[in-house]
């Protein structure tokens, strides 16, 4: 089932320096909650500056949903320590609030009024909040409070020069983009390994079912928690953050122009369902528009091709201008065993897996084949630890035992690990392979099995409160290592100034501005 990568691995072993200079970045979302686990109803803390313009700390869907962003970094330890500093500083500024340590929220009642993230009075800020109003009216606010970690990854130019002989210019743009699309196609085929190892949402609170009937064979605990005994990541299931209405968009990952055309089609195609919502009610705007996607970022995907945008540029126009610059992996649950929601083992594994995905052959995939890959993901998401579980290849009927496929994959990853360790010294990458490959023979070692044991004992709420309290105490006590308090204060003040400048520069009423930007 695993493609034959022996030639590509032999090439890599002859060109180890091609992997010198991998760049990464992390984003982590987390809800601000009160001591009893309920959602904080306070505004974004003043000490954290402007959520619109702060470089490192912003908000996602809700005013209480923090998002931490590291700068691009070539050093794993430095990146994780930077992320930890963001958490340390924030923990000191949250008063009695703490950060929820799980992907799935708990103490949010069905229909509870969740305040949308606020970004001030500028047209840009109001647009961001209106987009979130549209998300709420389309999918419900509860789904949008699910948190995750995003891992951004790019290969050095030296890799593309050695592998594809690229120099600068348009030909390089096309070849590099084609390489990243190969990575994405392999991710769709084999990325289920991420929720298998690191999924940490095997259970949900009853409010998530919102009274809707479900065919899933949930078991229920006395405290009202629903769980599937072999599930890994219900966050990635249809109960979590996915979007069924997008599954027939026909967006593919074979070619840059084809991909962008599919994206642009989706933001221009009206949706019968969203037309029903309407654009306004009682003078209040309900969504940016009634198209399948309000804006490109609404496309739900487990992985995205990205390029840093220029001012006023859409993500797809940035891709057309310069090609794919980096990849955003979006399938990581919050790691509940880390105070910052992610750890070094995960980052090193993702490095290895991304390199493998770019080396392995990946035939082009039609949109129907892409849908077939979803079957393996769903199987792993809902029953990944089930004894005897098998996986298929694309739309074919042949089935293979998951543990065998996992161990075959790790045989390749270990060779990538040896190459990366030869560049950096030590055996850190190989050690990660040894630790994680054991999860295929013993699923009890996976994140989902470990966290489920705690959740069955104390419920999602009890687990979340206990871990959140422990991390709050730990982070508040730890000294800052990279950033200093003065730098946080300077960025707070600068971000507020930047927001004020944007607001002062606006001359157009929002309705007129929106008409031009929709």
From Swiss-Prot:
Q: Which family does it belong to?
A: Belongs to the glutamate--cysteine ligase type 1 family. Type 1 subfamily.
Pathway(s) the chain acts in: Sulfur metabolism; glutathione biosynthesis; glutathione from L-cysteine and L-glutamate: step 1/2
Which Gene Ontology molecular-function terms are recorded? Answer: ATP binding; glutamate-cysteine ligase activity; metal ion binding
Keywords for this protein: ATP-binding, Glutathione biosynthesis, Ligase, Nucleotide-binding
Q: Per UniProt, what is one Pfam family of this protein?
A: Glu_cys_ligase
A GO biological process of this protein is:
glutathione biosynthetic process
Tell me the InterPro entries matching this sequence. Gln_synth/guanido_kin_cat_dom, Glu_cys_ligase, Glut_cys_ligase
Q: Which GO terms describe its cellular component?
A: cytosol
Q: What is this protein called?
A: Glutamate--cysteine ligase
Tell me which species this is from: Salmonella arizonae (strain ATCC BAA-731 / CDC346-86 / RSK2980)
Gene3D superfamilies, per the entry: 3.30.590.20
> What taxonomic ancestry is recorded?
Bacteria, Pseudomonadati, Pseudomonadota, Gammaproteobacteria, Enterobacterales
Q: Which reaction does it catalyse?
A: L-cysteine + L-glutamate + ATP = gamma-L-glutamyl-L-cysteine + ADP + phosphate + H(+)
> What EC number is given for this enzyme?
6.3.2.2
Q: Which HAMAP family match?
A: Glu_cys_ligase
Q: Does the keyword Lipid metabolism apply?
A: no
């Amino acid at each position: 089932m695993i493609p034959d990568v022996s030639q590509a691995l032999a090439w890599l072993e002859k060109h180890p320096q091609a992997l010198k200079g991998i760049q990464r970045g992390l984003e982590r979302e987390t809800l601000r909650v009160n001591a009893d686990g309920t959602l904080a109803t306070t505004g974004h803390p003043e000490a954290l500056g402007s959520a619109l313009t702060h470089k490192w700390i912003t908000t996602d869907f809700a005013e209480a949903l923090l998002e931490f962003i590291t700068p691009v970094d070539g050093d794993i330890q430095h990146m994780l320590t930077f992320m930890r500093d963001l958490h340390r500083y924030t923990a000191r500024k949250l008063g009695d609030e703490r950060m929820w340590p799980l992907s799935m929220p708990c103490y949010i009642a069905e229909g509870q009024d969740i305040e949308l993230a606020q970004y001030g009075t500028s047209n840009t800020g109001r647009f961001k909040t209106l987009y979130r109003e549209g998300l709420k009216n389309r999918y419900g606010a509860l789904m949008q409070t699910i948190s995750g970690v995003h891992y951004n990854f790019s290969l050095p130019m030296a890799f593309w020069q050695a592998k594809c002989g690229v120099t600068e210019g348009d030909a390089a743009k096309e070849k590099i983009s084609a390489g990243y699309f190969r990575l994405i196609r392999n991710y769709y085929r084999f990325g289920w390994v991420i929720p298998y190892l690191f999924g940490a949402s095997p259970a949900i609170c009853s409010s998530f079912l919102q009274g809707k009937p479900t065919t899933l064979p949930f078991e229920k605990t006395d405290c009202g928690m629903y769980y599937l005994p072999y599930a890994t990541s219900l966050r990635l299931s249809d109960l979590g953050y996915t979007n069924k209405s997008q599954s027939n968009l026909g967006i593919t990952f074979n070619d840059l122009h084809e991909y962008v055309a599919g994206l642009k089609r989706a933001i221009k195609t009206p949706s019968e369902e969203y037309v029903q919502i309407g654009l306004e009610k009682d003078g209040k705007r309900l969504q940016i528009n009634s198209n399948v996607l309000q804006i490109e970022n609404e496309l739900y995907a487990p992985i995205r091709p990205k390029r840093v945008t220029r001012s006023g540029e859409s993500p797809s126009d940035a891709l057309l201008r310069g090609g794919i610059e980096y990849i955003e992996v979006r399938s990581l649950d919050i790691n509940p065993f880390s105070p910052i929601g992610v750890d070094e083992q995960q980052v090193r594994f993702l490095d290895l897996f991304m390199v493998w995905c770019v080396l392995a052959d990946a035939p082009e995939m039609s949109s129907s084949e892409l849908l077939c890959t979803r079957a393996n993901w769903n199987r792993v998401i809902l029953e990944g630890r089930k004894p005897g579980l098998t996986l298929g290849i694309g739309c074919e009927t042949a089935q293979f035992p998951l543990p065998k496929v996992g161990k075959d994959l790790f045989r390749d990853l270990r060779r990538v690990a040896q190459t990366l360790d030869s560049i950096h010294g030590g055996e850190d990458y190989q050690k990660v392979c040894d630790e994680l490959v054991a999860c295929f023979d013993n699923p009890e070692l996976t994140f989902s099995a470990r966290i489920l044991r705690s959740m069955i004992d104390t419920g999602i709420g009890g687990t979340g409160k206990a871990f959140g309290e422990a991390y709050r105490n730990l982070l508040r006590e730890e000294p800052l290592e990279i950033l200093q308090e003065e730098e946080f204060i300077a960025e707070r003040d600068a971000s507020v100034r930047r927001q004020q400048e944007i607001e002062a520069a606006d001359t157009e009423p929002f309705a007129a501005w929106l008409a031009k930007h929709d």
